[in-house]
Amino acid sequence: LKLNWKLFGKIHQQIYRLSGGRLGARMGWIDVALVETIGRKTGLVRSVPIACYPYRDSIVVSASNSGKDSHPVWYLNMQANPMVTVQLGRERFRAIAEDVADDEREALWDTIAKLNKHQGEYLEKAPRKIPLVWLRREDSMH
C-alpha cells in the first residue's frame, strides 16, 4: 500500500490547525511547522506542513520536494512573496523566507541529513540544488 502524501498532508494540516498545534507538530523526532504562503498565481493563502530544523533565532526548511527535479510549489510561492506565517507547535509568528547563503549551506545540510536521513537521500538524488530556506521571525503573534 503506497501512501498518498498529498492526502496525508491535507489531513495532517487539518489536525495541526484544529488542535492549535498540540497535535501534528512532530513526526517522530522531527519538528513540523505549518507554513502559510500566498499563492503566486491565485493570491490565495496556501498552507502546508513542512519538516523544520532549528536555525539561528527561528527555523529552516528544505525545499527538497522528495528529491524531485522541480522545486515544491510552496517554495515558488515564497520566492514570489517571502512574507509567510508560521505555526510551530502552539506558537504562531510572521516570518520572511530567505534562502540560506551558500557559505552556510553545506554545514547546515550536514546537520539536517544527520537529523533526517530522508533529507540526505533527497540531496543525493535531486538533479538540482535544493534550497534551504530560513524562515526569519519578523515578530511574535501570541
Model-identified regions with their sequence ranges:
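Short, well-ordered beta-strand micro-motif
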Residues: W134-R136
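Short, structured beta-strand-loop surface elements
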Residues: N65-Q119, E124-K129, E138-D139
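Short beta-strand segments
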Residues: I30-S66
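Short helix-to-loop capping/linker segments positioned immediately adjacent to catalytic or ligand/cofactor-binding
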Residues: R22-L23, T42, Q119-L123
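N-terminal short leaders/motifs
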Residues: L1-G9, T37-G39, M83-R92
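Extreme N-terminal tail/first-helix region
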Residues: L1-R26
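Short hydrophobic/aromatic beta-strand or adjacent loop that forms the aromatic wall/cage
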Residues: V32, K129-L132
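Basic/polar N-terminal segments that are highly enriched at the extreme N-terminus
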Residues: L1-K2, D139-H142
